[in-house]
């Protein structure tokens, strides 16, 4: 009898929770319509996988890509709408959040074609891979719109858990297992430090969790200049630093890049930085409004260390993925300049513009790495020697993306860096911009070294891996090459049409 009553109470409680969730979704669903599209895509993937056989795998890719494209379309239709706060203040929609969500969706849309042939060749589980990618994308989108401390913690954990699973997806690979272990341990430690910083903010503001209410609470309690805020600032900087992976919080990056499946690395290398940058700008700019000098100093130190260490250590690398890992550490140093400049002097606009170009440059380079790895089974930089003689398209595409990463005119990377450094110079960050210019010259050296290997035509320098390289026929419609074409175009053409891109980026205000 007691069990029967308890069972009825459980059913009633579950029904109330479900009805409350349905009520929230019904009245607030329009605010998260792009996210709802991804959720429905996830449900469809599960239904198709459980009711069909392996022959229906093209449908899985189609549903994943379609849900991402539809989500992008929904975001574009919502552009320029008035800022709105929904879900009892937990979520905010405005142009600033939406452009970061667009960048995350764009990354995921380009990464799925990169993964098709890789998954088929390595015989990885397709459905789970796509589920993790879409769920990580969903977590990144919620993080961009998060407006309170709880959502800011839960959303990146959703992204991080999927990232851990993706990095260890090739369970039989020892390097993949090692990468996952390091990633998980350091990710758990950083999350703990982040929560510790949030607890100081929560206590100092008098129990507030919404970002703007925290500012009001700090004013009411007169705690905005207290030592507790300094502790919160340092702890939150460390926690977010793990997601952005600037020096000295970069230790996990090279090992995870080298050990994880290459399409996963391509996905993580851009989406994690976009989502973390969106979160960092809101956290530093709103709750720490009264401590702007302190967090500016912290970020300047991180930017200098990242630009110097990342680019110098990248020179010594022999693996393409490890080289790009250290290159990404240097690149995030450039992005931090935009965060420091802030909304004044177009700092955020320059950061968004550069991140858009960085996505295309980075994914285009990873597309070549995925293709070369599938054809040869190697990742060593020296083994790329003479690739132009066997696959001119792949070699030229990789060369263009690397030149754009180095900031060579008239490619997109040059104009992105020029705009970013110019905004930093106008804001008075002369030393920081000077370091950025010098380290950009250093980066050009190791990018050109790789390009020289790609273009060499002397038989004695062509490696056995390239001699045995088999290019896929044009009629096979290789999805990797499709992504590569899109990324190469985006890495070159936008350089001569910067004004519309900058105008859109400047329209992103809190």
From Swiss-Prot:
User: What are the UniProt keywords, alphabetically?
Assistant: Chloroplast, Membrane, NAD, NADP, Plastid, Plastoquinone, Quinone, Thylakoid, Translocase, Transmembrane, Transmembrane helix, Transport
Q: Name one GO biological process term.
A: photosynthesis, light reaction
Write down the top EC class of this protein.
translocase
Give me the segments passing through the membrane. 24-44, 57-77, 99-119, 124-144, 149-169, 183-203, 229-249, 295-315, 323-343, 354-374, 395-415, 418-438, 484-504
Record flagged with keyword Plastid: yes
This entry carries the following GO cellular component terms, namely: chloroplast thylakoid membrane
Q: How does it sit in the membrane?
A: Multi-pass membrane protein
GO molecular function terms attached to this record: NADH dehydrogenase (ubiquinone) activity; quinone binding
Q: What's the chief localization of this chain?
A: plastid
Q: What is its EC number?
A: 7.1.1.-
Catalyzed chemical reaction(s)? a plastoquinone + NADH + (n+1) H(+)(in) = a plastoquinol + NAD(+) + n H(+)(out); a plastoquinone + NADPH + (n+1) H(+)(in) = a plastoquinol + NADP(+) + n H(+)(out)
Domain of life of the organism in this record?
A: Eukaryota
Compartments in which it is found:
Plastid, Chloroplast thylakoid membrane
Q: Matching InterPro entries, A to Z?
A: NADH-Q_OxRdtase_suN/2 (IPR010096), ND/Mrp_TM (IPR001750), Ndh2_N (IPR045693)
Q: Which family does it belong to?
A: Belongs to the complex I subunit 2 family.
UniProt xrefs under NCBIfam families: NDH_I_N, PRK02504.1
Q: What's this chain's function?
A: NDH shuttles electrons from NAD(P)H:plastoquinone, via FMN and iron-sulfur (Fe-S) centers, to quinones in the photosynthetic chain and possibly in a chloroplast respiratory chain. The immediate electron acceptor for the enzyme in this species is believed to be plastoquinone. Couples the redox reaction to proton translocation, and thus conserves the redox energy in a proton gradient.
Q: State whether it acts alone or in a complex, and with which partners, per the record.
A: NDH is composed of at least 16 different subunits, 5 of which are encoded in the nucleus.
Q: What is this protein called?
A: NAD(P)H-quinone oxidoreductase subunit 2 A, chloroplastic
Organism encoding this protein: Nuphar advena
């Amino acid at each position: 009898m007691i069990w029967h009553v308890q069972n009825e109470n459980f059913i009633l409680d579950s029904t109330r929770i479900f009805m409350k969730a349905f009520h929230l979704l019904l009245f607030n669903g329009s605010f998260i319509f792009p996210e709802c599209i991804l959720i429905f895509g996830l449900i469809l993937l599960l239904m198709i996988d459980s009711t069909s056989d392996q022959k229906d795998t093209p449908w899985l890719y189609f549903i994943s890509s379609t849900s991402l494209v539809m989500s992008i379309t929904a975001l574009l239709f919502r552009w320029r709408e008035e800022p709105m706060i929904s879900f009892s203040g937990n979520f905010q929609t405005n142009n600033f959040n939406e452009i970061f969500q667009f960048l995350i969706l764009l990354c995921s849309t380009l990464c799925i074609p990169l993964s098709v042939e890789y998954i088929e060749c390595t015989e990885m589980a397709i459905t789970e891979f796509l589920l993790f990618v879409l769920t990580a994308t969903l977590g990144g989108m919620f993080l961009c719109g998060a407006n309170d401390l709880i959502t800011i913690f839960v959303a990146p954990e959703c992204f991080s858990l999927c990232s851990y699973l993706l990095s260890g997806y090739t369970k039989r690979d020892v390097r993949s297992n090692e990468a996952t272990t390091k990633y998980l341990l350091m990710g758990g430690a950083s999350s703990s430090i982040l929560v510790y910083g949030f607890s100081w903010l929560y206590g100092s503001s008098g129990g507030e969790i919404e970002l703007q209410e925290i500012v009001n609470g700090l004013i009411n309690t007169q705690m905005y200049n207290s030592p507790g805020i300094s502790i919160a600032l340092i702890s939150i900087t460390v926690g977010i630093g793990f997601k952005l992976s600037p020096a000295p919080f970069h230790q996990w990056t090279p090992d995870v890049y080298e050990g994880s499946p290459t399409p996963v690395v391509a996905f993580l290398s851009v989406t994690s930085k976009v989502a973390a940058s969106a979160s960092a700008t809101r956290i530093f700019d709103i709750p720490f409004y009264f401590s702007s000098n302190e967090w500016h100093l912290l970020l300047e130190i991180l930017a200098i260390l990242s630009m110097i260490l990342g680019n110098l250590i990248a020179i010594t690398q022999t693996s393409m993925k490890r080289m790009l890992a250290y290159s990404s550490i240097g690149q995030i140093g450039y992005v931090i300049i935009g965060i420091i400049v802030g909304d004044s002097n177009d700092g955020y606009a320059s950061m968004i513009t550069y991140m858009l170009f960085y996505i295309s440059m980075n994914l285009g380079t990873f597309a070549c790495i995925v293709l070369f790895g599938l054809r040869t089974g190697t990742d060593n930089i020296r083994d790329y020697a003479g690739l132009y003689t066997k696959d001119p398209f792949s070699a030229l595409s990789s060369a263009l993306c690397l030149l754009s990463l180095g900031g060579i005119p008239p490619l997109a990377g040059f104009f992105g860096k020029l705009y970013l450094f110019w905004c930093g110079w106008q804001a008075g960050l002369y030393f920081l911009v000077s370091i950025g210019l010098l380290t950009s010259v250093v980066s050009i050296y190791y990018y050109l070294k790789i390009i020289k290997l790609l273009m060499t035509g002397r038989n004695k320098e062509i490696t056995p891996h390239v001699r045995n390289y088999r290019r896929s026929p044009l009629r096979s419609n290789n999805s990797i090459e499709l992504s590569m074409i899109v990324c190469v175009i985006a890495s070159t053409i936008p350089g001569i049409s910067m004004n519309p891109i900058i105008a859109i980026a400047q329209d992103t205000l809190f």
